[in-house]
Design a protein with these regions (language model features):
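N-terminal low-structure segments adjacent to metalloprotease catalytic domains
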Residues: 1-136, 207, 359
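Post-HEXXH active-site segment of zinc metalloproteases
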Residues: 3-13, 233-262
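Long, well-structured alpha-helical subdomains associated
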Residues: 37, 58, 65-70, 74, ...
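Nucleotide/phosphate-binding site architecture used for ATP/NTP-dependent chemistry
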Residues: 120-159
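Active-site scaffold of zinc-dependent metalloenzymes
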Residues: 150-217
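Short, charged/polar micro-motifs that form catalytic or ligand-binding hotspots
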Residues: 210-222, 251-259
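Active-site recognition of the HExxH zinc-binding catalytic motif
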Residues: 218-235
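Post-HExxH zinc-binding segment in Zn-dependent metallohydrolases
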Residues: 248-285
Length: 359
């Protein structure tokens, strides 16, 4: 077994067995070693700077030494080379061994101790592992929501939320970091008018920490609604969707398919509640975060948002909800049909759906 350095001791809680934290972090390193090469160089370096900041426990706004980050990146890449071919380790607790994807079994032991763990698959079918302090547990529409605070182990990419079965894992520390990154991008470019409106009345320049706390707490609600939408979408698409994603992993077809499911989830859950609440700042923040493939797929939704900005009338956005649900469910089923028809060769055909799938 190859050795790899664990995170600093300061990352670990007194209630956490240090050996457990080391194993989880090791599995994170193995996953990163296998998948870090999937990012473009620019995205990779940005993610590594953020990862360095987290591992060193530095404040979000702290300036980073390029020289120090560079040395750390080189060291981390050497460590990844040592573990890339290693299998993921089982977790050892109370005399038992747990598969790293046995979330229910692991959390039965950890939740009473104020800890939470998740192991699941994200974009490009990359395994994501994390271990954190349990902030609170909620129930929402029959689903269990586990909200974490401080993170003791994580991988290069730290998704703020993940749904596994009927459990939603929401990582507040990661969400806070995402909010900060969006605000920082806006401060540099000042081109995102939706973000300008979302932050109106907040003193970003002088009270950044307070703004981060406020916006993060506000966005927790909508992250949960999106994850509930993911569950609802999964109930309509079935297990065949996961099989299809495995087939098209690491292709443009996967990016497209995930964007379609995100759209379906939002039309099923996020947008109906968001528009019903008519929370101006949250609506603006939602559209400020709409980018890439998802924005490209829904020009009509973006125009309806602009109509609301101009008139203050939500009718255009509300009128899109029924048609949006039908449209994205239809596109998702079309992708599944292509997978059934073409099997391992379906990626090319699914990519062909992109042009005619815009709404």
């Amino acid at each position: 077994m190859n050795e790899i350095s664990p995170p600093p001791k300061s990352k670990f809680s007194r209630r956490l067995p240090r050996s457990l934290g080391i194993i989880v972090q090791r599995n994170c390193h193995i996953s990163d070693a296998r998948f870090a090469g999937d990012y473009s160089l620019c995205i990779y370096l940005l993610k590594m700077r953020e990862y360095y900041r987290w591992e060193k426990g530095l404040p979000l706004g702290a300036s980073l030494s390029n020289e120090a980050v560079g040395r750390w990146v080189q060291q981390r890449e050497r460590q990844w080379e040592q573990v890339e071919s290693d299998p993921y380790e089982q977790l050892h607790m109370v005399g038992q061994r747990f598969d790293p994807f046995d979330n229910d079994g692991i959390n039965r032991e950890l939740l009473p101790r104020g800890l939470v763990y998740s192991g699941g698959y994200g974009r490009f079918c990359k395994p994501h592992f994390f271990l954190g302090r349990l902030l609170r547990t909620e129930r929402c529409r029959g689903y269990t929501v586990l909200i974490s605070a401080n993170e003791y182990a994580r991988d290069l990419t730290a998704p703020p939320a993940m749904t596994l079965g009927r459990t939603i894992f929401l990582r507040r520390e990661s969400l806070r970091r995402v909010v900060w990154e969006k605000i920082e991008e806006w401060r540099w470019k000042r081109q995102n008018q939706a973000m300008t409106r979302a932050l109106a009345g907040l003193d970003v320049e002088h009270e950044l920490e307070r703004v981060l706390e406020r916006v993060t707490d506000r966005e927790l609600t909508w992250i949960i609604r999106h994850e509930i939408g993911e569950i609802m979408a999964g109930e309509q698409l079935g297990d065949a969707w996961h099989d299809m994603l495995l087939t098209v992993a690491r292709t443009p077809a996967e990016i497209f398919a995930r964007a379609v499911r995100d759209q379906l989830a939002d039309f099923l859950s996020t947008l109906p509640v968001l528009l019903e609440c008519a929370d101006t700042a949250s609506i603006d923040f939602y559209f400020a975060g709409l980018h890439g493939m998802r924005k490209e797929l829904c020009p009509t939704l973006v125009r309806a948002y602009q109509d609301w900005v101009d008139t203050g009338d939500l009718d255009e956005l509300n009128s899109m909800l029924p048609a949006g649900k039908r449209h994205w469910l239809s596109v998702a089923h079309s992708a599944l049909d292509l997978h059934r028809q073409h099997g391992d060769e379906c990626a090319h055909y699914i990519e062909g759906l992109m042009k005619d799938s815009r709404m």
